[in-house]
Amino acid sequence: MAEEVPSINIEEWKPRTSIGNLVKNGKISSIKELFDRNLPITEPEIVDVLLPKLKYEVVDIKVVQKQTDAGEISRYKVLVIMGNMDGYVSIGTGKAKQLRVAIQKAIRDAKMNILPVRRGCGSWQCTCGEPHSLPFKVVGKAGSVEVNLLPAPKGTGLVVGSVLKTLLTYAGIRDAWSTTKGETRTTENFVRAGYSALYNTYNFVTLQDWARKR
């Protein structure tokens, strides 16, 4: 179930990095500008300012044990998917003794991993030209899992696994097919492989990109 990312008081934010200062002072006014300038997200508050009204969903909760001198200590490990449903998506993990704290840490981690996703109409069966799917086939890997994402015609929907469907929905992709290899029952690796595939949408230079550069 999607929930809104808790907002912060921007006035109380004291940036710790030069990029954070640029954002707070209005020298960088959009998340697109940040990525166009090839600048990293150095503080989670940068995302709060440039990409408000994000939503997130907890997709995996595990109880993990850590061996200490005092014995085993149990902690929660949480995996969340975050996005604006319109071209930006992320994943994050967090560990803590309390579930609420683990979720907060996962949200903070996800803000640091925000990714722009290139969308398009890459299926030969569709010529609408709208950004409803992927521009081309992309592949992502994590552990033993490999995910292939393929563009689909408008109206197809997301013909993918349930967790992958959540990831693509948060990225703003409405139509896609997928094929997978490996141990897809491992939720974290499955999600990370899908995230890696979406990252690769910007690893290819299209003819349109060349035209814009010339």
From Swiss-Prot:
Keyword tags: Ribonucleoprotein, Ribosomal protein, RNA-binding, rRNA-binding
GO cellular component labels: cytosolic small ribosomal subunit
One Pfam family, short name: Ribosomal_S5_C
Gene Ontology molecular-function annotations: rRNA binding; structural constituent of ribosome
Any one biological process term the GO annotation gives: translation
Annotated ranges, domain S5 DRBM: 54-117
UniProt record similarity statement: Belongs to the universal ribosomal protein uS5 family.
Classification via PANTHER family: 40S RIBOSOMAL PROTEIN S2, RIBOSOMAL S SUBUNIT
Summary of subunit composition and partner proteins: Part of the 30S ribosomal subunit. Contacts protein S4.
Domain notes from UniProt: The N-terminal domain interacts with the head of the 30S subunit; the C-terminal domain interacts with the body and contacts protein S4. The interaction surface between S4 and S5 is involved in control of translational fidelity.
Its biological purpose: With S4 and S12 plays an important role in translational accuracy.
Name of this chain's protein: Small ribosomal subunit protein uS5
Native species: Saccharolobus islandicus (strain Y.N.15.51 / Yellowstone #2) (Sulfolobus islandicus)
Gene of this entry: rps5
